[in-house]
Regions:
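Membrane-proximal helix-turn-helix segments that form the acceptor-binding/catalytic region
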Residues: 70, 103, 109-126
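A short beta-strand/loop micro-motif in the catalytic core of glycosyltransferases
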Residues: 76-77, 122-131
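Carbohydrate-associated surface elements
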Residues: 132, 152
C-alpha cells in the first residue's frame, strides 16, 4: 500500500496572529480533502485546530539538535520566519516551504532579514500570499526568489450568491486581510 503524502504547517504558537490561523486551517482542510495527511505543528497551543486537524507539539531542543528529520511528514510548511531558526539550524532532510505573510513591524522585518541571511539557501521554496508581499521581501532582501500563491477560498463557505438580506449596496467588495502599510 502506498504511503499517504503528508504536510505539517509550522508556527511558533497556535492560534497565531491575524489571518495566519485561517490560512493554515483551510490549507490543512483542503489538503485533507485531497487525500493528504496534514497537521499543525507549534511550540505551544492555546486552542485545538478545527476540522479534526492533527496537532503536533514541537520540541525546540529536538529540532535544534536533529533538525526536521524527527518530524514524520514529507513536507514542512513554515508560516513564520522565527520558526526557521529551529527548522533549519541542522541541514534539513525534508523540503521546507516558507510561506511569507508579510512583516508588519521593524522587529519582524529584522527577524526576516536575519532568517533569510542564515537560511535562505536551505529553504526549498519561498511563497507569498501576494505580490505586495514579494515586493516587501525584495526591499528587505535584494536577492530573493519567491512565487505568489494566493490564499485559497472555500467557495461553499464564502460565495457570491448570498441571499439578498446579506448584501448591502452595490458594488460588493469582500476584503479579508489586515490593513498594513506595505500593502498600499
Amino acid at each position: 500500500m502506498k504511503k499517504q503524502k503528508s504536510v505539517i504547517m509550522v508556527v511558533a504558537k497556535y492560534p497565531t496572529t491575524f489571518g495566519h490561523t485561517s490560512v493554515i486551517n483551510y490549507l490543512c482542510k483542503g489538503l485533507n480533502e485531497l487525500g493528504y495527511r496534514t497537521a499543525i505543528g507549534a511550540f505551544s497551543f492555546d486552542a485545538d485546530p478545527p476540522f479534526n486537524i492533527e496537532k503536533i507539539k514541537l520540541n525546540k531542543r529536538k529540532l535544534l539538535t536533529t533538525g526536521n528529520s524527527y518530524l514524520d511528514f514529507d513536507l514542512i510548511h513554515a508560516h513564520q520566519a522565527r520558526v526557521l531558526y529551529y527548522l533549519l539550524s541542522v541541514k534539513p532532510t525534508k523540503p521546507v516551504v516558507f510561506h511569507y505573510h508579510g512583516a508588519s513591524n521593524k522587529i519582524q522585518e529584522t527577524n526576516f532579514k536575519i532568517a533569510m541571511w542564515r537560511y535562505k539557501d536551505k529553504i526549498s521554496k519561498i511563497i507569498s500570499v501576494s505580490y505586495a508581499g514579494i515586493n516587501q521581501m525584495k526591499q528587505l532582501v535584494k536577492d530573493i526568489s519567491a512565487e505568489v500563491v494566493y490564499n485559497g477560498v472555500d467557495t461553499k463557505l464564502f460565495n457570491q450568491d448570498l441571499p439578498a438580506p446579506y448584501k448591502k449596496g452595490t458594488p460588493q467588495l469582500l476584503f479579508v486581510s489586515g490593513l498594513r502599510k506595505y500593502k498600499k
